[in-house]
């Protein structure tokens, strides 16, 4: 089953999640695709994900003839609070730079020139959306406009935060 995103681009109804797979990530991603998964969810968050090992799996799958454009790749930007002290970006940089650095690192890890979906892993603000959330979102919108991601999204939000984002996002 496929859904349609806000920009009329197909969206898979389920994805294989790669959190907490550790050193088994490469093998398990290959097994997931062999078992019928066509969408892979990861994040540039070393405390819980091994995004570079997802990239190794994608390289192995390519050698077996599975083309990049047949797979849906989703990754996420995680703010410094969720990084466990191992941020994939300069934590002293402004948030827009952190988003770009994390995204560029994800492209290298995954061995691709674009992702199908880039998600804000969680808002920085506990209630509502604050200035920091909007700075991150604006950087993500810029990545969308550049064509480096086909869609953007958010996870781990309260209903009110999602409503606010839908009302005010560009």
Where are each of the predicted segments found?
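Glycine/proline-rich, positively charged
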Residues: 20, 87-170
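N-terminal binding-site loop/beta-alpha segment at the start of enzyme catalytic domains
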Residues: 1-71, 75, 113, 139, ...
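Short loop/turn segments at strand-loop or loop-helix junctions that form parts
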Residues: 75-78, 120-121
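Short, glycine/acidic-enriched loop or turn micro-motifs at the edges of active sites
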Residues: 44, 79, 124
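Short acidic/His/Gly/Ser-rich catalytic and metal-binding motifs that mark active-site loops
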Residues: 81-85
